[in-house]
């Protein structure tokens, strides 16, 4: 049987069945610090900090709360079925009166403008916007750490309580410090599950038995009540997507007026500008010849980094923003 699953909290290869996510989270939170553990003492696992958000709402932020929920461009947004599934789920949630948790920052970064076209054609854009999944651009965003800042009140609460807060994204990498420097647990999920967890606002939920929220009439709503069926998705796909959407968009993909307007000088090789502070000729290539000299014996060298397994370039030098209080920020 094929079961829905996620991956995390620190490596993309660490698969977790959706049905086991709640118990997995409880174990992960208090497990020793490692690939899946966060080292929180059991006595502190229920710790929470009161937050007064920028909109005036008051809530308690705690371990396991999802502060970033992002449908990202890299992995799933070339798959219309899951993208439309996320849109239909959003529509069904809005019809029930459900909202995204006030501490969760949702975003939508389609991998193609075609996604925007078929969302508009299917009438799903408004529902996604209603939940806060606004289109923030076409390209690499949250997965590489370009999610933008959290609300200052949330940022301060995380710092004060040393909270292990989470992100749920539809990206392909979730290494520590990559998505956001304050978010210690990051899980990869399908676009519909990103929407679902944004509404739930926490990993401390079993969707099979726990309500995802309360509707406008005060009745509990289960995820199954709003989850789109395959028939719903296929019906919307048949009505909203045409081959012309792809051919029209991709026929001009190599031409962009703003890019074409940048002045340039034709040349066989890139004309490095010595005064540039942004793009510079690496010193490694100075004096290089077609036939390099053989590597000589290395004596008296020191090891710069001696690392264990599963240490990536993202651990050494995260691609996203770095905190003002860190060494790089100073």
Question: How should these model regions be labeled?
Answer:
Residues 126-130, 255, 263:
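Short, charge-rich amphipathic segments
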Residues 17, 60, 67-72, 105-108, ...:
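Structured core elements
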